[in-house]
């Protein structure tokens, strides 16, 4: 690897079915922070990404979608980028990672002083209320959406400065977390449920995709249906709390305490959990 003083701060690696839906917002957010030339995309339609000035585009054109194969490929890209970058950020195109608002810094500023090996984020499914308009790509998530549901399926090791291998969905990685990596400084805003019109775009792309596995095909197609609401919303108590509320900390601690480790598997958990309350994310 190049010396740390000449390596760039972060390589952002994602998978995109196409250059529509959430990709423009993803590109705008991470491009402002790290530069579009440091964003790398794995995609079945490489020709759609030729004009963005990206750091690299890996083609999987003609192949069925395979979650494990995708994770393996993106792990290899991230580990290769580590020769030129201090950090790798591996996430889906609808995942926006921000430091907790009370820290008062952006992600670039946060990483510039962080020395952890792997960082986990606290994941929130962002919701669109009936009164909220379509998503505006010029605004931050917290400037246009008010509520979210904490979801441990989104407590992911998105950021690493050491070699890691990711599981399908990037839920886990091959490295045991350090004490500081689970402190909750970072939040992932998951945008799957954040805009009904974009969900319709996503559904169109999902329905046109071929899959290698019946289970992942069923999950992708059902979860992209724009007519549905978040499946756990009806189970929520309706209680609305702040992100820094003790209940949120308790939920995170309990969830992270359920993580297990096995050398042959890495980090894993038997069941994901969705919080019984809502979180206020608007300012």
Predicted regions and their residues:
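Residues at the starts of beta-strands that form the adenosine-phosphate
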Residues: 9, 37-38
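Catalytic-site signature of metal-activated, phosphate-bearing donor transferases
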Residues: 70-72, 99-283
């Amino acid at each position: 690897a190049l010396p740390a003083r000449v390596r760039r701060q972060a390589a952002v690696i994602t998978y995109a079915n196409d250059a529509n839906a959430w990709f423009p917002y993803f590109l705008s957010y991470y491009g402002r922070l790290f530069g579009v030339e440091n964003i790398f995309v794995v995609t079945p339609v490489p020709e759609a990404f030729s004009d963005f000035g990206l750091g690299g585009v890996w083609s999987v054109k003609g192949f069925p979608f395979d979650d494990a194969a995708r994770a393996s490929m993106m792990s290899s890209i991230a580990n290769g980028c580590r020769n030129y970058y201090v950090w790798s950020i591996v996430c889906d195109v609808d995942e926006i990672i921000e430091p907790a608002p009370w820290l008062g810094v952006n992600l670039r500023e946060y990483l510039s002083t962080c020395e952890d090996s792997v960082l986990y984020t606290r994941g929130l499914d962002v919701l669109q209320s009936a009164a909220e308009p379509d998503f505006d790509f010029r605004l931050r998530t917290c400037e246009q959406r008010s509520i979210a549901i904490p979801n441990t399926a989104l407590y992911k090791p998105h950021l690493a400065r050491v070699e890691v291998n990711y599981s399908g969905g990037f839920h886990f990685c091959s490295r045991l977390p350090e004490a500081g990596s689970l402190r909750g400084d970072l939040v992932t805003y998951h945008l799957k449920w954040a805009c009904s019109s974009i969900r319709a775009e996503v559904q169109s792309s999902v329905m046109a995709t071929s899959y290698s596995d019946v289970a992942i095909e069923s999950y992708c197609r059902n979860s992209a249906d724009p007519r549905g609401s978040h499946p756990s919303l009806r189970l929520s108590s309706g209680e609305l709390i702040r992100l820094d509320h003790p209940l949120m900390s308790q939920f995170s601690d309990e969830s992270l305490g359920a993580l297990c480790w096995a050398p042959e598997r890495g980090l894993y958990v038997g069941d994901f959990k969705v919080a019984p309350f809502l979180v206020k994310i608007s300012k």
